[in-house]
Amino acid sequence: MATMLINHMLFLTSLLIVVFPVANAIPARDIDKLCKETTDVPFCLKYLGTDPRIPAARDLTDVLLIAITQSKMQVDDATTHIDRVRRKFNGPHGRRRIEVCKTNYGIASARFHTAWELGLQKSFWDVEKLARIGTNAVIDCENVWRRDGPIQTSPLTFYNMNVFKLSGIILLIFNKLVT
């Protein structure tokens, strides 16, 4: 009898662990609907809609945390890219611009990390503020390539635009959470 009870409890616990997150997951149609409210639907569907963590997301707070994580991943990838391309920019303007981007991506990384931590605490206004600061640092990295000297093509435009678009998604989710 005791063995049957233990087996039954293990089965129910396993069932709860496996089924509970899925049963309470945010429906995929809600993610599609959210993405349709963004300025770049295919981008949103690519980065949020296909994220393997989305099926386990219970609510918009979890989706917000995933979007912040996606931003942090883009920032980290850009930082790695900076290290790879830095030697291609040996002129004074290129070196200065790469250093501005390296510094700004350091700021963005720290801000998105803290935003994620505050998102866990549901401190949404602080999340919004930090996501803006991180995004503005990335935007400045894009803009520095057009300031103070000859215009150059930024080697980080891909990452800069991804962070900018993810920021729009973060702000959209933020607005839904606070209104």
Swiss-Prot record:
Record flagged with keyword Signal: yes
Disulfide-bond pairs as recorded: C35-C44, C101-C141
Gene Ontology MF annotations: pectinesterase inhibitor activity
Signal peptide: 1-25
Known tissue expression: Expressed in seeds, buds, and mature flowers.
Keywords: Apoplast, Disulfide bond, Secreted, Signal
Pfam families (UniProt xref): PMEI
GO biological process: regulation of seed germination
Listed SMART domains: PMEI
Localization annotation: Secreted, Extracellular space, Apoplast
Cellular component GO terms, alphabetical: apoplast
PANTHER family listed in its UniProt record: PECTINESTERASE INHIBITOR 5-RELATED, PECTINESTERASE INHIBITOR-LIKE
Family, per entry: Belongs to the PMEI family.
Function, in words: Pectin methylesterase (PME) inhibitor that targets PME from seeds and modulates PME activity and pectin methylesterification during seed germination.
Name of this protein: Pectinesterase inhibitor 5
Organism: Arabidopsis thaliana
Lineage: Eukaryota, Viridiplantae, Streptophyta, Embryophyta, Tracheophyta
Gene name, Swiss-Prot/TrEMBL: PMEI5
